[in-house]
């Protein structure tokens, strides 16, 4: 299968085809798992405020930006312009890098919590680390296929 066909073509979908074309259906996974990271970080204790502050910023920023892009694609704001394909690829590359840095920092904060915190708080942070890495992987996959779409446009 050609790269353009594997990535859903060289144009962005509009309407509810956002939920049926790859890689754009990954918006839903980014939304769900990114929201879980946000909730888990917000509900946990903060042993390293600076590190977890960055994780919180990344999760909220990416949640809002992903939701905004998804809504803009559904209502067809892009109008088939190639500049939106560039925006899509750039956003997902930046989001993947941000989430990778946030995942590493959250893992560091969780490791530092091992002694002196309850298991409940420790397990919340472990879940946040796992979901942060899952979201990182989803953003990387979306970025790769967005770059393929960008190159073929």
UniProtKB/Swiss-Prot annotation:
Keywords, ordered alphabetically: Cell membrane, Lipoprotein, Membrane, Transmembrane, Transmembrane helix
Post-translational changes noted in the entry: Lipoprotein.
InterPro entries (alphabetical): MAL (IPR013295), Marvel (IPR008253), MARVEL-CKLF_proteins (IPR050578)
Summary of the knockout phenotype: Abnormal myelination and optic nerve morphology.
Gene Ontology annotations of biological process type: central nervous system myelination; myelination; positive regulation of extrinsic apoptotic signaling pathway via death domain receptors; protein insertion into plasma membrane; protein localization to paranode region of axon
Positions of the MARVEL domain: 18-151
GO cellular component, one term: hinge region between urothelial plaques of apical plasma membrane
Protein name as it appears in the record: Myelin and lymphocyte protein
Annotated gene: Mal
